[in-house]
């Protein structure tokens, strides 16, 4: 159905980026979840402020929507320094990187999203910038080419990635602070939903917030996106307030089931069962059958399905689990005959 809620749109909808910014916490004190990460960051940030130095370079990795960008912004706020944002695909050539780096002031924070997508040549230029706060720029071409060394102000690079396994060892080794973000528990997500509802000036009952949280795939960005959609239903179909009944009605209308799975999740599981006898089957083959990008399946959908026990990785490919069969109301081929073999 064309009007089904696509879980990918919940990760950072372009037309709702302003809402995402409004709902972001601005300090470590206001940040919910990731307790160990937050406590360690408080120490590292305080130490850098006491020494009046740039914070060591930080690598944040984990599934989409867990707060990597938000934490990066908070770090800059806590340090009281400037914050510049770019991404790996945007930094196409060394000159692009040089332009960003030379614009930084002392102890500023540079956030590079999707840092695993940096081109090899740009990544090499980044090494000396991270280690020695300098870059070497080649002027002219051919016999007249010469290298000019440019000194940079001390800065903190925060790299964010959903696929840390794609980072090269030399780049990974240059991050002094390495932090993995985990999926959120329901209690924390419920607090986030209630906080966001308050900011959006909409009344949301505790049970309704729990219902939204339980279907948010452990991801704050999805919880906030679902809250905004439920708010729409509450205004049009109800009195504007969000209770459990309107929350359940809205989420069912969006085809988000009680596990937080959407239409593509269920289609993925069904495809493995119907076309590949439950697996094992390779990711590229699954992607072709679904008409989806393999990277999208691996980065966006698969982590949650694995975490919740619907699929598992094996040396021969992906397999669906008994939980997936039960969830879809299906039985394994030949299952009833086992007793009579």
Curated annotation (Swiss-Prot):
It is an enzyme of class 3 (hydrolase). It is found in: Cytoplasm. Residues 3-184 are annotated as: Large ATPase domain (RuvB-L). GO terms for biological process: DNA recombination; DNA repair. ATP binds at residues 23-24, 65, 68-70, 131-133, 174, 184, 221. InterPro entries: AAA+_ATPase, AAA_lid_4, DNA_helicase_Holl-junc_RuvB, P-loop_NTPase, RuvB-like_N, RuvB_C, WH-like_DNA-bd_sf, WH_DNA-bd_sf. The keyword DNA repair applies. Gene3D superfamilies: 1.10.8.60, P-loop containing nucleotide triphosphate hydrolases, Winged helix-like DNA-binding domain superfamily/Winged helix DNA-binding domain. Residues 258-341 are annotated as: Head domain (RuvB-H). One of its GO terms (cellular component) is cytoplasm. DNA binds at residues 313, 318. Keywords: ATP-binding, Cytoplasm, DNA damage, DNA recombination, DNA repair, DNA-binding, Hydrolase, Nucleotide-binding. Pfam families: AAA_lid_4 (PF17864), RuvB_C (PF05491), RuvB_N (PF05496). Residues 185-255 are annotated as: Small ATPAse domain (RuvB-S). Its EC number is 3.6.4.-. Belongs to the RuvB family. Has 3 domains, the large (RuvB-L) and small ATPase (RuvB-S) domains and the C-terminal head (RuvB-H) domain. The head domain binds DNA, while the ATPase domains jointly bind ATP, ADP or are empty depending on the state of the subunit in the translocation cycle. During a single DNA translocation step the structure of each domain remains the same, but their relative positions change. The RuvA-RuvB-RuvC complex processes Holliday junction (HJ) DNA during genetic recombination and DNA repair, while the RuvA-RuvB complex plays an important role in the rescue of blocked DNA replication forks via replication fork reversal (RFR). RuvA specifically binds to HJ cruciform DNA, conferring on it an open structure. The RuvB hexamer acts as an ATP-dependent pump, pulling dsDNA into and through the RuvAB complex. RuvB forms 2 homohexamers on either side of HJ DNA bound by 1 or 2 RuvA tetramers; 4 subunits per hexamer contact DNA at a time. HAMAP family: DNA_HJ_migration_RuvB. This is Holliday junction branch migration complex subunit RuvB. It comes from Parabacteroides distasonis (strain ATCC 8503 / DSM 20701 / CIP 104284 / JCM 5825 / NCTC 11152). The lineage of its organism: Bacteria, Pseudomonadati, Bacteroidota, Bacteroidia, Bacteroidales. The gene is ruvB.
């Amino acid at each position: 159905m064309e009007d089904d809620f696509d879980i990918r749109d919940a990760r950072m909808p372009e037309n709702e980026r302003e809402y995402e910014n409004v709902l972001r916490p601005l300090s470590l004190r206001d940040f919910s979840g990731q307790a160990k990460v937050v406590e360690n960051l408080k120490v590292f940030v305080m130490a850098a402020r006491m020494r009046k130095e740039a914070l060591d370079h930080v690598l944040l990795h984990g599934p989409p929507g867990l707060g990597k960008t938000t934490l990066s912004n908070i770090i800059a706020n806590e340090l009281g320094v400037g914050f510049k944002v770019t991404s790996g695909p945007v930094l196409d050539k060394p000159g692009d990187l040089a332009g960003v780096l030379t614009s930084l002031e002392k102890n500023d924070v540079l956030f590079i999203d999707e840092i695993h997508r940096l081109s090899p040549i740009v990544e090499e230029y980044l090494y000396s910038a991270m280690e020695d706060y300098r870059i070497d720029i080649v002027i002219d071409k051919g016999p007249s080419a010469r290298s000019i060394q440019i000194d940079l102000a001390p800065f903190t690079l925060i790299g964010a990635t959903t696929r840390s396994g794609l980072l090269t060892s030399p780049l990974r080794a240059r991050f002094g602070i390495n932090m993995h973000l985990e999926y959120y528990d329901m209690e924390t997500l419920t607090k986030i939903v209630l906080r966001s509802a308050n900011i959006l000036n909409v009344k949301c009952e505790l049970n309704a917030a729990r219902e939204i949280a339980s279907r948010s795939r452990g991801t704050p960005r999805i919880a906030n996106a679902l809250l905004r959609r439920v708010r729409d239903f509450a205004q049009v179909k109800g009195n504007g307030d969000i209770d459990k009944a309107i929350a359940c009605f809205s989420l069912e209308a969006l085809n988000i089931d009680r596990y937080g799975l959407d239409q593509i999740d269920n289609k993925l599981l069904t495809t493995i069962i119907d076309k590949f006898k439950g697996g094992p089957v390779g990711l590229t083959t699954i992607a072709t059958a679904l008409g989806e990008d393999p990277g999208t399946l691996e980065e966006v959908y698969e982590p949650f399905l694995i975490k919740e026990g619907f699929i598992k990785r094996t040396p021969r490919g992906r397999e669906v689990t008994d939980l997936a069969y039960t969830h879809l109301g299906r039985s394994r081929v030949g299952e009833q005959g086992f007793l009579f073999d």
